[in-house]
Amino acid sequence: MNTKFKYIFSAAALLLSVGLTSCTGDLDVTPIDPNLNTKDNTSPESSLNKCYAHIAMAGNGGANGDSDVDGIDGGTSGYVRQLFNSQELTTDEAICAWGDEGISNMNFNTYDASHPMLKGFYYRLYVGITYCNQYLADFGDYNATMSAEVRFIRALNYYYLLDGWGNVPFTTAISSDKPARIQRADLYKWLIDELKNEVEPKLNDASPKTSTTTGYGRVDKAAAWMLLARLYMNAEVYTGTADWANAKLYAKKVIDSPYKLYTTKKGQWSAYQQLFMGDNGENGASVEAVFPILQDGLKTTSYGTTLYLMAGSNDNSEHIKSATVAGNNTTGGWAGNRMRPDLVLKFFPNNDAPNVAAYAMPAAADDDRALFDGEGRNVSNGDDEKSVKVFTNGFSVCKFNNFKTDGTAGHNALFPDADFFLMRAAEAYLMYAEADARQNNGTTTAQGTAYINALRTRANATTQTAYSLRQICDEWSREFYFEGLRRTTLIRFGYFGGNVNYNWNWKGGVKSGRNFDSHLNLFPIPTSDMVANSNLIQNTGY
């Protein structure tokens, strides 16, 4: 397949028109319209593209309609958008000013089985699984590598279901039968077996690419290693038995692969900043991108991917580039998500964060990763729920922007060209270091220390001779804030639900934070699915 992947998402989506049940419907009916013979109406290539595209786009209509998931606004249902909401708004990193239904429940950890955004994400994951099952039913014997890619995408979706919901409906086929409920530990085992036996051996060898390279945006062996490392990192949460040795093994495979930390500064832009810019597929940063989710301002548009991470976190008064240039280089400034004070403290532990613009903040923090704006803003999110809804109560995150290192314009005034690196090599460095510390009485060995120091050196931050687990948890936040990993990280460290006494501002709906029940370590199965499928059992506490 020689077509550059980034530029055929939209065409592929239009080529494949699949009839799915509404997200307010059920999983107990045939998810593919039985009157539509997809094998005769599309090609293996376009069917494969749709499996990828459901992560990058709302649906066949791009940003503006025909969403894959009904019952929720198409842009709101975006994969990355709801990954962010579920993983960031529920934690010590982000809080949102909006009054949309479900937002305050995420801010304050009070979600239940009717939560519209959790339901939307749940069904988007199953829509993607359906696309993958359909591809494998129609074209599973067509090309071994393509089938392995589809199996990886299906496994990735099941991984997010495993992580978020635990005991979920499970099917690998297109059928009118109600899916059986799979236990969390059994789904974990299935994922390990699937990735080791059916995915990794058949994927292409690990090879970083740029947007001008054939195959950019398609997964290779490194993505399988990364997902295996994620699974092993959280094995104790998922199964009750830790497996730090295998977490290190698969993280090391990524570290030793051709994927590397990107370390080249260009002009005013640090190496770290370039990972999140409008030309991150072209500027060299993609050497770190194990799995980039592709965006293009003209051809692959979405309100739920990098535009959400830019516009949703900015009001366009931020000064990212210079004192004379305001905004993130899109016309979007939706003034929603911003930092909780706890995240600011990760960079300014003495509680002395200055009210300076984004372009000046990294120097003030002595850390290139401090990509946020404090100009005209308060560190505090406010003293009551009304003040939480004021966007300037909280520093504005400017991590993602649509500027380009060569100064050229974006392809579109609103929709960015910045890809979202769903998996990047830096994650393997931190996974190895954490697993290393857990095998060494809570402190890194020389090798684990070296991997964290590599990240900190890239960020021009000071290094240390060793790191404790608490320091590693903070380092996860500094390196990956607003990238959709935090909730999983806090649960793994024992810092989320239960009597953990790790509190943050507005945790549990109290300004000073409070413990909440451990049942919130799992999301609730949506009520609509519970009603539709008698095989399911609601997670405890809902």
Regions found by a protein language model. Give the residues of each.
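Flexible, polar/acidic helix-loop-strand segments at domain edges
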Residues: D100-G120, M339-R424
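Membrane-proximal, proline-rich intrinsically disordered regions
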Residues: C23-G78, S534-Y542
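Bacterial Sec-dependent N-terminal signal peptides
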Residues: N2, Y7, S17-S43, A155, ...
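Short coil/turn linking the two alpha-helices of tandem helical-hairpin repeats
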Residues: L162-G164, P169, S207, N234-G240, ...
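Long, intrinsically disordered, low-complexity segments
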Residues: C23-T24, T38-P44, I95, L125, ...
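Glycine-rich, aromatic-lined ligand/substrate-binding cores of catalytic
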Residues: M57, V287-V388
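Conserved, well-structured interaction surfaces
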Residues: E45-N49, A53-G59, E93-W165, D177-K189, ...
